[in-house]
Design a protein with these regions (language model features):
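Polybasic/polar functional segments that serve as interface/processing modules
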Residues: 1-129
């Protein structure tokens, strides 16, 4: 039976940014604040780890939220840095609020996204603004 309250929204963001988190504590703090700012509840994490491998150097953070997960990957070797952000939730969220926060917090110079309804497939959602 279908749950009328349950939804499946997935926001995938690729951003190039000038000011990104470069240490574990900094990203962990940002993720907590970010999750709170979009009215989500953390169940586990955020778990954050810095990878020092040349060519793949950067930081990854993952949090389990009450309605699914949030992940962020930052490669800090390129200039501007590359960020990949994944927000999946079974509750409503505003993709504009998320995009604006990322743009402002990280001095984003380029941002691309896909917003999907995954309830019965991988259907793109057209944003109106």
């Amino acid at each position: 039976m279908k749950n009328p309250v349950l939804i499946h929204k997935h926001l995938i963001i690729r951003a190039e940014a000038n000011r990104v988190p470069t240490d574990e504590e900094q990203l962990q703090h940002w993720m907590r604040e970010f999750i709170d700012s979009i009215d989500m509840k953390i169940l586990m994490g955020p778990y954050v780890k810095y990878c020092k491998m040349e060519g793949n150097r950067g930081i990854t953070g993952i949090a389990v939220i009450e309605t699914s997960h949030i992940a962020i990957h930052v490669w800090d070797e390129p200039n501007p840095a590359l960020m990949q952000i994944d927000v999946y939730s079974c509750a409503e969220f505003d993709p504009y609020v998320i995009a604006d926060k990322i743009k402002n917090d990280f001095d984003v110079v380029k941002l691309d996204y896909k917003y999907l309804n995954r309830e019965t497939g991988l259907k793109p959602i057209r944003l109106k603004k």
